[in-house]
Amino acid sequence: MVKIVDTTFRDAQQSLIATRMRTEDMLPIAEKMDEVGFYSMEVWGGATFDACIRYLNEDPWERLRALKKRIQNTPLQMLLRGQNLVGYRHYPDDIVEKFVIKAHENGIDIFRIFDALNDVRNMETAIKTAKKVGAEVQGAICYTISPVHTIDQYVELAKKLEEMGCDSICIKDMAGLLTPYEGYELVKRLKEEISLPIDVHSHCTSGLAPMTYLKVIEAGADMVDCAISPFAMGTSQPPTESIVVALKGTKYDTGLDLKLLNEIRDYFMKVREKYKMLFSPISQIVDARVLVYQVPGGMLSNLVSQLKEQGALDKFEEVLQEIPRVRKDLGYPPLVTPTSQIVGTQAVLNVLTEERYKIITNEVVNYVKGFYGKPPAPINPELLKRVLDEGEKPITCRPADLLPPEWEKVKKEAEEKGIVKKEEDILTYALYPQIAVKFLRGELKAEPIPKEKDIGKILEIPTEYIVEVDGEKFEVKIEPKIGTELKRKKEVITAEMEGAVTSPFRGMVTKIKVKEGDKVKKGDVIVVLEAMKMEHPIESPVEGTVERILIDEGDAVNVGDVIMIIK
């Protein structure tokens, strides 16, 4: 008998609609899903935490509690990025411990824990803490293909995870690269050499996943990850209903009720209709190019979202071609959060700036320095030269060993900002300090769900007005203007002005590193922008003096906005 892990509330919607499903769409069907008999339901972790506060104006902790209240029989599962938790950097051990404890208290029964580089040192603290609180731990192995990845390596990794106390092993095939026969060999070897249950997680991006599931089940896989059909296929998982029928009447029969699954499917068809404008054609089709570019499902939908945000969706093909080049430069990391974000964002910047590594993200710098762990293969020497100072070498210890405790510090900061109502708020602030302050103060609004535009309806906006001021009438004509203007104190600053420094992309100002009157050299970091979930240092294009600073920390800027005048 094969068991099914349901991913509809987490990875499925993350892969297809960039994690925009609201809690209000989950709760009405949660109790019925609890009746199905899934091995577990993956409902939290991954990008859901970030999306809740950044886009949906929802408290992710409250979502978890609400789901736990309605799902009493099925274990709730989350995806935890090891030392990265649900963020995009390494957090110190005290934050990791506190997060795991609180996640368990709020309803998580099973922690699926992975490290993007398969560096088990980055999984140690999370595994130990989850075991300590009595949760089930599933150690996940990120599957990828490259000149340096082999079945033998994956088997050795699984043995290490078994020794560390994991209760089961997950083959996490985030890009849909696992072929049916390679999957068969991998699972067969694992069943021969370790004694833990095996779960296989894949995506349909390349079209291989349903076939691969049948072969890994034949090889002895105990569980497979599936999604209810309206949120299946494309960059998501295989459909639950199809897998249930495929195995019916065999020794692998799941025992799940197809009638009940179809009732759940009918509900999600309505949910799908609500979000239909978020379903990108790119993430819904089978795209065998993934076998070349190795872009995971969640990364693909986020890539589309990021390029739309930057007004550069026409660069999609170029970015797809750049991703494998950046991945090779970085030593072939598996493309899963946060490395998918690190590689993907750097590839986007390389294309948008029309020069490779003209802007290098802080995350790439930290990755190259070893702060994310040990890469599977050596990093491109040219990139090492650009990132490392003379005589500097990447670290070789467990990255978290270099991180001082943060809990007391972030607790004090959060309390001073007046944003703490419960202990979980401190963790939210620790993970996402910039966005959390606005969220916890109630300053954010949920982004609207895109609606289908009325076809054929033309909205006419007048372009000429008569304006009366103190009895005198003026004729005003409004025309679209190419380029970006930023008005400050009744004057207009344009990108054409001498010394104007413009934003290379759309984002939020997180740090201003200079003051008016400061002298800067070409290449000095003047501003840090957060865009595409990463922080990007913006360098001065010239040597000179900072005459004007036209932005404040927390401001949103668009591509081409003038942010400073440096002469």
Swiss-Prot record:
One of its GO terms (molecular function) is pyruvate carboxylase activity. It comes from the Archaea. Inhibited by magnesium, when its concentration exceeded the ATP one, and by high concentration of ATP and alpha-ketoglutarate. InterPro entries: Aldolase_TIM, Biotin_BS, Biotin_lipoyl, Carboxylase_cons_dom, OadA, PCB-like, PYR_CT, Single_hybrid_motif. CDD domains: biotinyl_domain, DRE_TIM_PC_TC_5S. Its cofactor is Mg(2+); Mn(2+); Co(2+). It catalyses: hydrogencarbonate + pyruvate + ATP = oxaloacetate + ADP + phosphate + H(+). Heterooctamer of four A and four B subunits. Pyruvate carboxylase catalyzes a 2-step reaction, involving the ATP-dependent carboxylation of the covalently attached biotin in the first step and the transfer of the carboxyl group to pyruvate in the second. This is Pyruvate carboxylase subunit B. It comes from Methanocaldococcus jannaschii (strain ATCC 43067 / DSM 2661 / JAL-1 / JCM 10045 / NBRC 100440) (Methanococcus jannaschii).
